């Protein structure tokens, strides 16, 4: 049970509540990205590679979209979410990718 009173927040953990996340915004997890990449309008139109790995061993994805075959007229580098609290940038970038792919 969570309570916000005055300028404080209090949460009482329930039985079996082993994994709980508090967030200042709408969380954007790896599951969100994987679900987005499986959308019919996205699947096959985005190339996914591993750019690097984090210190904890997680993949940092590199997404390429647009002119995948041949030389593109332009190259644009977009980046989002340098820190876990910057999840809104991931939603914005997802929307931008969807808009570009919708132009095809």
Residue ranges and their predicted role:
Residues 1-104:
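M14 metallocarboxypeptidase catalytic domain recognition
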């Amino acid at each position: 049970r969570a309570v916000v009173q005055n300028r404080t927040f209090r949460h009482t953990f329930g039985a079996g509540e082993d994994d709980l996340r508090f967030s200042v915004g709408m969380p954007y997890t790896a599951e969100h990205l994987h679900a987005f990449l499986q959308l019919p309008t996205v699947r096959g139109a985005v190339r996914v590679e591993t750019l690097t790995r984090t210190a904890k061993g997680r993949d940092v994805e590199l997404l390429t979209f647009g002119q995948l075959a041949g030389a593109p007229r332009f190259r644009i580098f977009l980046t989002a979410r340098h820190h876990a609290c910057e999840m809104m940038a991931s939603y914005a970038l997802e929307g931008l990718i969807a808009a570009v792919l919708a132009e095809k």
